[in-house]
Amino acid sequence: ERIPVIGGTKRIHLDRIEQLKPDLVIASKEENTREDVEACRAFTEVLVTDVRTIPDAFEALEAIGDALEKAAAGVTWRSNIETAWGEPRAQHAQALYAIWQNPLMVAGHDTYIHAAMNWWGIGNAAPAAAEGRYPELPAEQLDALAGTPILLASEPYPFASKHCAQFASAGLRPMLVDGEAFSWYGSRMLHTVDYLKDMRQTLDQLPH
């Protein structure tokens, strides 16, 4: 059965959502606007998630289970993912994580991406003093990060092999990565364990 298209996170079609008569709308504080959330609350229940850390992601699984009246399933999902993810790893490798091009924007330190990197032992090389959750990095800051690996995510900006030369010429070490593995929380976390382990090992094995 074809799933109706209701728009993207920034531009949702409220009329189409209302026509579907949902029992629940799950929104993200980071992605969805207050206006859209309040508009949805006029015709249905809304659960707003605010996930910035790995424990936040674990708790969101149970919250979604409760909201769907599937509390036991939520607890099971949480338990399975907590077991799969284990304890945070010691940090060795450092990397930037690029989410956008022109201007270059990277994941800052108050993001789920940062938390996922840290959990798997990848330090975030973005300047701690950079403003905003996804700060822009000007050329002079890149100069100071010469030799640093930069992870070029597949989303939201679709980085591809054609972009690698630009970053290599700036003295960085570009690597294309699956954006979903680093930025999608929820049940997807169960399927990204091996990928994130391998990415950490790859970074650790880079010559210094």
Show where each model-derived region lies.
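N-terminal ligand-binding lobe of clamshell/alpha-beta domains
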Residues: 1-208
